[in-house]
Amino acid sequence: MKKKSSLSEEDQALFRQLMAGTRQIKQDTIVHRPPRKKISEVPVKRLIQEQADASHYFSDEFQPLLNTEGPVKYVRPDVSHFEAKKLRRGDYSPELFLDLHGLTQLQAKQELGALIATCRREHVFCACVMHGHGKHILKQQTPLWLAQHPHVMAFHQAPKEYGGDAALLVLIEVEEWLPPELP
């Protein structure tokens, strides 16, 4: 189907007359290159390996000594207890969130391992793990697993805005870790 021109025959003739003697410009200045692939993509094999490596830290048989009274909290022996206080007050805001709702214990361990590996790779030092209330299986196991991991510096029950007693704020040790300056 031929497109109708909105110009009158007179205007078309005038346009042709004015354009007589001109030639079409050859496009020779801009070269369109195909888009480059992102180099920062992490290979799938590496992600699977990180997940498997990180999940081997979590044992169901090992029971670390955690305080059962009050809010759930843990501070590694070489870390200041003030870090747990900062987590409780909400001085650290999590950059990554992990929701464990509906996962089995095995899946939850793998996801926790992947979260810690991702935090270390992306230099994220605070994450929120939402275990929920449910049947209290993940709520009881999550702190025990986190306390076993060598890169977990501290964790504390999350403030209300991040899930309250159904979540934990976790402080992860990354290379060259420096606490942020408080205003």
Curated annotation (Swiss-Prot):
Main enzyme class: hydrolase
Gene3D superfamilies, A to Z: 3.30.1370.110
Pfam families from the UniProt entry: Smr (PF01713)
Entry EC no(s): 3.1.-.-
Superkingdom in the source lineage: Bacteria
GO terms (BP aspect): rescue of stalled ribosome
Annotated ranges, domain Smr: 98-173
UniProt function note: Acts as a ribosome collision sensor. Detects stalled/collided disomes (pairs of ribosomes where the leading ribosome is stalled and a second ribosome has collided with it) and endonucleolytically cleaves mRNA at the 5' boundary of the stalled ribosome. Stalled/collided disomes form a new interface (primarily via the 30S subunits) that binds SmrB. Cleaved mRNA becomes available for tmRNA ligation, leading to ribosomal subunit dissociation and rescue of stalled ribosomes.
HAMAP family: SmrB (MF_01042)
Subunit structure: Associates with collided ribosomes, but not with correctly translating polysomes.
Protein name: Ribosome rescue factor SmrB
Provenance organism: Escherichia fergusonii (strain ATCC 35469 / DSM 13698 / CCUG 18766 / IAM 14443 / JCM 21226 / LMG 7866 / NBRC 102419 / NCTC 12128 / CDC 0568-73)
